[in-house]
Amino acid sequence: ALLNASVQDLMKLDRTEAVYEAILSRQNVPVEYLREALTGLAGLQKKDAVSLLLSMIGANDASGQTSNISSLGQLLTEQPAAALKKARNTLEDLATKGKAEETRRLGYAAIMTADGSGENALFAASQSKDSLRDWLAAVPSISNAELRGNLFSSVRSLMFELPPNLKAEASGGSLLQPGIAVDYFQPSASNVAIE
C-alpha cells in the first residue's frame, strides 16, 4: 500500500520508518515533506542526516535507481558544511566512483559545499574530461549563492583552456569535410520529349 499511495496520503499516516522511507524514495516530492521525512527517519534510526542520506544515495546508485537522487541531493547540499566535512571520503567516492552522472554531480556539489570552495573538487575532477563535465554540471546545483558566484573564475578559465594534463582532441579528417551537400535539379522544360 505504501508503494502506491500518494505523498499527501503518506503524510496523513502514522510516522513510521516505512512511511518515511516511502516518502524519501519518491520523485517530485515537495522539499518540506522530504525534510520532515529525513529528520523523522534519522531520529528513528538514531543516525545523523548526512550519513543517512549518503547511505540512501549510495544504495540507489548501486541499484541503478536514480529517479530520486536529485531530490536527495538537494537535501544533502542543504546540510551544514561541518557535517559534510565529516563524510568527505564518502563524498569523494560518490563524485569519482558513482555509476550514474547524477550521483557524481551530487558528489562534487557536496564536496564544494563542504569545502566552501571549488578548488579541491576541481583538482579531483581534472583527472579526466568526463569528471570535468560532471564538475561543471554540479555547479548550478550548489544551493549557496555566494559559493556558486565564487566559482565563476574557475568555470570561465575552462572556457579557454583545459587543465594541463587534459589535451584537446586532435583535429581529425572528419572535421575537414563539408557540413552539407545539396543536389539541385532544374525542372525540365515543357517542350522536351521524353525518350
Language-model features: locations:
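Long, ordered, helix-rich scaffold segments
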Residues: 1-195
